[in-house]
């Protein structure tokens, strides 16, 4: 046996895994066992990768056996841990237990034309409905809470269904979120922070950072995975034995350009998620003969987001999805417009309905692509999203609301004339001038004759200076990996289990085609827990019933009931600057909310603001839905009012 294992280790498994492996710390004693391997550390359950799937698995394993030795090993530093879950939209989907079959129908429809086994999708739909009470209890125990992603408690019907033309799209569900207890509002990175808090408070979970997993160790006769080889932060190489199994929760290959070219067939694509996902788990899985699936797909429905790449960050920013000014357009490699720039593609994760199918936007084929705008947009709109992407959520870069800092850095090109701007972009000045002139002419006509852009979103590009930023096709994560069953066990090409090897999260996801917002983070939790349950032979009994209100139902509370009568000035720090609201309260009820100063800085129109105010007055509470098209700004208003009256 010694000879067989050593051959596997030295030859068959000589691959590099740069994702999610942890150091053992000081004082570790090495032992040599009957299998002929010198083990430097021995644990019961080893988790490779510390994102949402890995954290969920560790917490579930600790619930099952508080005495089990659980080691989570992570490639990134502690400050940059969390995987793509920390850079995501922070939503997980919860279907009603009474409507699981309808939701299952929707899941199956989204996975066409690349269906997964029906028993898999059926299991997933049921887990999404069942796991909410475990999540709720887990968060209650560590100072966090589950609520609606738009603020306040969960409410049926609050979920935005992205593909309403598919069978099952009328399922009953809600968009759930995790935030600090009693905060009542959206929390950036909330899911990750909540599960990180749950994991770090458990004494039998060890988390090691800045360590590299370089091999799986496998018994070639039984095919069982015995453990891993890792290099620690100080450069030492160690062998870690995992008696009950190894879970690979180390993400996809979005930061491996060669894999992108090989599997997606793209020339150039970047990521707005963690820079740590470079396909290392995929290499390990392929080396041991795991059956691979979904290698072309990614978590954003296969649609590429519009990224802004800058020299200072590995990951991209995300181009803003809406703008107050319409003085912008995008051009392709020939300097011409190539699609309708103003549609709400982000509501279908950057897909467009064409020929009766949800297809990718054409940016990858149109490269290079540039976003051109004028001084009006520059001064009034942030070019990038202020709440999405790794540089913002994790590396905490604050993009200036008027883009001035980024112009100064040279990230955004600036020129006094369109012709000068074209030269800086590398285009023929006549080509860009012709495109701008045609666009401006259609603004005068009140109709986009080329691509049907809503004239309400079109403003002349005429107020110099003029600006341009290059657009890079961007994704958050890939979903390819090994095929896994509902126990999160990795399968070979004969659909047989590879013993003691598990997989969860993005790596080998069940998402094979379209992606509904919230499905992926829900799967990370479900698959991570399934791996722990299989490896440790049990299931957590931790549970706490969560209250989910019916659509239109209130929580029978009034936020303003204890507020003294009076008129208050509430300062709002919005997406594009500060503005002041006048809030009048009489007899414990809010009677008026209006903009007193700084209306030009408010990133929502009058109709959207009126809808938000009406919701607050109708419920006499801040537990209201955010407004479509102004989600972040409505949340800023709700948070600021809440903070003002509770400080």
Residue ranges and their predicted role:
Residues 63-85:
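Glycine-rich FAD pyrophosphate-binding loop
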Residues 559-647:
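Active-site- and interface-proximal helix/loop "cap" or "latch" segments in soluble metabolic
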Residues 37-53, 71:
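Beta1/beta-strand and adjacent pyrophosphate-binding region of the FAD-binding site
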Residues 233-309, 521, 527-530:
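Glycine-rich loop(s) and the adjacent beta-strand/alpha-helix scaffold that form part
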Residues 282-284, 291-424:
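An anion/pyrophosphate-binding glycine-rich loop and adjacent beta-alpha core
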Residues 126-236, 257-258, 305-307, 443-463:
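Conserved redox-cofactor binding core of oxidoreductases
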Residues 450-480, 548-593, 597:
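Structured beta-strand/loop patches that form or line metal/cofactor-binding pockets in enzymes
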Residues 215, 224, 431-510, 595-598:
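A glycine-rich dinucleotide-binding beta-alpha-beta segment and adjacent secondary-structure elements
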